[in-house]
């Protein structure tokens, strides 16, 4: 093969009349490669003529006009050794002859031209031929991807609420739909509201605040719709909290929980009035106050013993007010004397009679009369001053009422009250004897 290449080069040097661009096109288009392949394949293929010979002859004649015979001979010699190659090599040879400049020497062209001609001429056509294949493969991939694309339907279900949509999993939404049908609700939002009402105690236990927002003006529409078809009392989860607060106050003041009936219910004038921009908030608050009033009524019906006790106490208080003498009696003014010792709260927690261990007990025990014990504390100007001096006015009012009731209720009420005050059994026995003496003195005073 090397020998054939050298022979071709020497033949080209001996023919100076051959134009360099034509020779360069023949050599750069694959003439050397074709000669090497022909030397390896044998000489039997050179005898058979082919149509490529005429094609290469026509291309080389169009390239050179004044050297047509020499160019045709060179092209024929190259085609006889390379007729088995693809025709695009010769098309590249024609393009290279028109565009490539003539090199300075023939040996330099052998080193540079094949490397430039192969990517420039043949490479471009190979890429062009491979382009449709790549595009078809891309279309096939896109078609396969389109077949495997996930559906555009949202897996979450949209539920109405507070002017926006709530996104929830499909399983949760299915359960909400089923519950809506079973409860007979009109919308899924109503069902979710019902679920929140049922779970309010657990929500309060978990968060400490609950789900009732502080800004009612932002929930006018929701409250209005909820008030029309509420299936359960809205304030019911908070009833136990209100009762707990009342019980704590009662325990702090020293009397039982049934005395919360003495506390007045909220007056009607404190009910909030609906505003034009928030018509649902006022209705909601009025409903809560009505439910609170119903709660007190239910408690009084469920506890008949406590109710009877409260009625008895009210009757005793009315009888005490009727039997009380005018407040201008100078003999009754001594009752506020123990206030000078600094025991204001202890004085009103205890009945009006004196004890042997108290200050001035000897003189006070002989002069106290039973009717004076029923006198209301508000009748004494000095007692009012004591009340104003104290910070807890409402607590003192309740304590004063309890003191008067315990004084008129006999030994049982006095014993019950002094058990809360932490007295010893000996003091309680002495109190019973004093109660008996006070009752006899009261009977004598009433007979006189």
UniProtKB/Swiss-Prot annotation:
GO terms for molecular function: DNA-binding transcription factor activity; sequence-specific DNA binding. The keyword Nucleus applies. One of its GO terms (cellular component) is nucleus. It is found in: Nucleus. Residues 152-206 form the TCP domain. Keywords: Activator, Developmental protein, DNA-binding, Nucleus, Transcription, Transcription regulation. The keyword Heme does not apply. It comes from the Eukaryota. Residues 263-277 have a biased composition (Pro residues). Signal peptide: none annotated. Residues 34-68, 142-161, 258-282, 295-336, 387-448 are annotated as: Disordered. Pfam families: TCP (PF03634). Residues 34-62, 391-406 have a biased composition (Low complexity). Residues 295-304, 413-432 have a biased composition (Basic and acidic residues). PANTHER family: TRANSCRIPTION FACTOR PCF3, TRANSCRIPTION FACTOR TCP4-RELATED. Transcription activator. Binds the promoter core sequence 5'-GGNCC-3'. Forms homodimers and heterodimers. This is Transcription factor PCF3.
């Amino acid at each position: 093969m090397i020998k054939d290449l050298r022979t071709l080069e020497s033949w080209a040097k001996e023919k100076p009349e051959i134009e360099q661009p034509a020779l360069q096109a023949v050599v750069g288009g694959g003439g050397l490669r074709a000669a090497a392949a022909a030397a390896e394949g044998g000489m039997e293929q050179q005898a058979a003529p082919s149509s490529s010979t005429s094609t290469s002859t026509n291309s080389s004649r169009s390239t050179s006009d004044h050297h047509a015979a020499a160019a045709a001979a060179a092209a024929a010699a190259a085609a006889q050794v390379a007729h088995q190659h693809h025709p695009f090599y010769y098309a590249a040879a024609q393009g290279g002859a028109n565009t490539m400049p003539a090199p300075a020497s023939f040996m330099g062209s052998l080193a540079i031209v094949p490397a430039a001609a192969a990517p420039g001429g043949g490479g471009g056509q190979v890429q062009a031929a491979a382009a449709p294949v790549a595009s078809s493969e891309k279309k096939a991939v896109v078609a396969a991807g389109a077949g495997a694309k996930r559906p555009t339907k949202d897996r979450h279900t949209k539920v109405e609420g507070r002017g926006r949509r709530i996104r929830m999993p499909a399983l949760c939404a299915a359960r909400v739909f089923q519950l809506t049908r079973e409860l007979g609700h009109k919308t899924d939002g109503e069902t979710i509201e019902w679920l929140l009402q049922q779970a309010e105690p657990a929500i309060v236990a978990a968060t400490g605040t609950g789900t009732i927002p502080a800004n009612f003006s932002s929930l006018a529409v929701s409250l209005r719709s909820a008030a029309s078809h509420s299936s359960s009392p809205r304030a019911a989860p908070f009833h136990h909290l209100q009762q707990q607060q009342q019980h704590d106050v009662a325990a702090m003041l020293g009397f039982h929980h049934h005395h919360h009936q003495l506390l007045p219910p909220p007056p009607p004038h404190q009910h909030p009035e609906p505003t034009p921009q928030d018509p649902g908030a006022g209705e909601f608050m009025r409903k809560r106050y009505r439910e609170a009033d119903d709660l007190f009524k239910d408690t009084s019906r469920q506890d008949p013993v406590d109710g009877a006790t409260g009625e008895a106490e009210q009757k005793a208080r009315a009888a005490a007010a009727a039997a009380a003498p005018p407040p201008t009696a100078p003999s009754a003014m001594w009752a506020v004397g123990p206030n000078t010792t600094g025991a204001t709260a202890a004085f009103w927690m205890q009945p009006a009679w004196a004890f042997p261990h108290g200050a001035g007990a000897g003189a006070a025990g002989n002069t106290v009369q039973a009717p004076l014990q029923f006198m209301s504390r508000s009748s004494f100007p000095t007692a009012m001053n004591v009340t104003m001096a104290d910070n807890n006015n409402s607590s003192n009012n309740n304590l004063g009422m309890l003191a008067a009731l315990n004084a008129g209720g006999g030994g049982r009420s006095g014993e019950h009250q002094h058990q809360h005050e932490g007295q010893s059994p000996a003091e309680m026995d002495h109190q019973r004897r004093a109660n008996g003496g006070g009752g006899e003195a009261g009977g004598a005073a009433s007979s006189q």
